[in-house]
From Swiss-Prot:
Name recorded for this polypeptide: Fusion glycoprotein F0
Signal peptide: 1-26
Fusion peptide as annotated region, ranges: 116-141
Entry similarity comment: Belongs to the paramyxoviruses fusion glycoprotein family.
Record topology, Cytoplasmic segments: 522-529
Recorded name of the encoding gene: F
GO cellular component: host cell plasma membrane; membrane; viral envelope; virion membrane
Subunit structure and binding partners: Homotrimer of disulfide-linked F1-F2.
Transmembrane segments: 491-521
Length: 529
């Protein structure tokens, strides 16, 4: 008696645990979704990039070689020639745009003084320009340094011999100046001047400058096609900055905790605003955004496993990503987003409305979840979730590695859930997996679950189904038209005629029904005799 009671208690506890696991967590009912092969494989916070901050960065292409002038004149002359081939086309394109942008000023009637109203683009003089180029041209004008600032910057760059230096100008923001080969000159060539011959120093510097020029060409080469609207990522800039991207970002004043997310999402961009072919430097406007976390929004990633109904293989059609906020479930467009362990970073709002039927599906109504037949090669026939293996063992070979036996899936089961109590180590599709304690029921019976409507995602099938639906609509239209004709003909009858017809029908019924009854009785009597 005690043994039977113990078994009952253990069974009750086990079922209670399973019921707890099947309850929805938040808005999405993971328990019911797992019955049709849909599981969540990760959740993360949601962050959106907000308005960018701007700062100027100068790439000083010509290093300070005052102490090496006697040994490097030939190499420097060749290096300058190469730089001009890159810089002059960019300079000409920038000048062509900025010369056709002028200030618009208006005169206030009260104080009779001019005030700035904006900028206007001289389209007639410019000729052909795309919308992106026009927008970039206006932004270029607004971020340009004044001619006086350029002169001051040129003078400061000629005297500095630091690889990275912050230059502050009166009344203006700090400008960061970077030279990619200055550290090499300061730390390797100058200390070894007494040990190396002049020719060898020139050769070493020439090779270093040639390599640096190659990096500059790969960085700014695409800008030769469209210098106005071309954007450069900070990762690409790191090559021209000597590879020390962290030091540069620190000098720029960026200390946000989401730096990794912005870097991975390539949110930091640079645009050329000035090219100087006299002192060989490029001025860039660096835009680096801040991140705003949208509170209470969680992004979930979904994965599906195929399941079998008889000889047919199906899978549930759900989005790859969804987002929850309060009771609301939204679709999530991941095209502009980067996914990291710390959260999801998007360059723009990625949420958009979800249909009520799909929301019902995700909340646990499996009959609202559309399904489609597997065609060709399907990605997932097994998946590991919460330490348990969810597998479609009717389509792939499932084997218990511990005992060497085949794990079979009964025809009335749509999926198999394998845990350590069933088989500690499983071999599925050639992959050996060690599973954990049970988190899901052993299997899901087909007759215990309501499946959703079948749909087709193949283009040919969709077209065929659409054609069939149109044909049925045309048939229904013809039937409606014929019924309208009958109704119109009925309208032509007078009310008196309708009354006569009804009386005749009633009299016919009163006479016909008794006659029919008498005939039936007569036949029954004959059979009885």
């Amino acid at each position: 008696m005690s043994i039977m009671g113990l078994k009952v208690n253990v069974s009750a506890i086990f079922m209670a645990v399973l019921l707890t696991l099947q309850t929805p967590t938040g808005q999405i009912h993971w328990g019911n979704l797992s019955k049709i092969g849909v599981v969540g494989i990760g959740s993360a916070s949601y962050k959106v990039m907000t308005r960018s901050s701007h700062q100027s960065l100068v790439i000083k292409l010509m290093p300070n070689i005052t102490l090496l002038n006697n040994c490097t004149r030939v190499e420097i002359a060749e290096y300058r020639r190469l730089l001009r081939t890159v810089l002059e086309p960019i300079r000409d394109a920038l000048n062509a745009m900025t010369q056709n942008i002028r200030l618009v000023q208006s005169v206030a009637s009260s104080r009779r003084h001019k005030r700035f109203a904006g900028v206007v683009l001289a389209g007639a003089a410019l000729g052909v320009a795309t919308a992106a180029q026009i927008t970039a041209g206006i932004a270029l004008h607004q971020s340009m340094l004044s001619s006086q600032a350029i002169d001051n910057l040129r003078a400061s760059l000629e005297t500095t011999n630091q690889a990275i230096e912050a230059i502050r100008q009166a009344g203006q923001e700090m400008i960061l100046a970077v030279q990619g080969v200055q550290d090499y000159i300061n730390n390797e060539l100058i200390p070894s001047m007494n040990q190396l011959s002049c020719d060898l120093i020139g050769q070493k510097l020439g090779l270093k400058l040639l390599r640096y020029y190659t990096e500059i060409l790969s960085l700014f080469g695409p800008s030769l096609r469209d210098p106005i609207s071309a954007e450069i990522s900070i990762q690409a800039l790191s090559y021209a900055l000597g590879g020390d991207i962290n030091k540069v970002l620190e000098k720029l004043g960026y200390s946000g905790g989401d730096l990794l997310g912005i870097l991975e999402s390539r949110g930091i961009k640079a645009r050329i605003t000035h090219v100087d072919t006299e002192s060989y430097f490029i001025v860039l406007s660096i835009a680096y955004p801040t991140l705003s976390e949208i509170k209470e929004v969680i992004v979930h990633r979904l994965e599906g496993v195929s399941y079998n109904i008889g000889s047919q293989e199906w899978y549930t059609t759900v989005p790859k990503y969804v987002a929850t906020q309060g009771y609301l479930i939204s679709n999530f467009d991941e095209s502009s987003c980067t996914f990291m362990p710390e959260g999801t970073v998007c360059s723009q709002n990625a949420l958009y409305p979800m249909s009520p039927l799909l929301q019902e599906c995700l909340r646990g109504s499996t009959k609202s979840c559309a399904r489609t037949l597997v065609s060709g090669s399907f990605g997932n026939r097994f998946i590991l979730s919460q330490g348990n293996l969810i597998a479609n063992c009717a389509s792939i070979l499932c084997k218990c590695y511990t005992t060497g036996t085949i794990i079979r899936q009964d025809p009335d089961k749509i999926l198999t859930y394998i845990a350590a109590d069933h088989c500690p180590v499983v071999e599925v599709n050639g992959v050996t997996i060690q599973v954990g304690s049970r988190r899901y029921p052993d299997a899901v019976d087909l007759h215990r679950i309501d499946l959703g409507p079948p749909i087709s995602l193949e283009r040919l099938d969709v077209g065929t189904n659409l054609g069939s639906a149109i044909a049925k609509l045309e048939d229904a239209k013809e039937l409606l038209e014929s019924s309208d004709q009958i109704l119109r003909s009925m309208k032509g009858l007078s009310s008196t005629s309708i009354v006569y017809i009804l009386i005749a029908v009633c009299l016919g019924g009163l006479i016909g029904i008794p006659a029919l009854i008498c005939c039936c009785r007569g036949r029954c009597n004959k059979k009885g005799e």
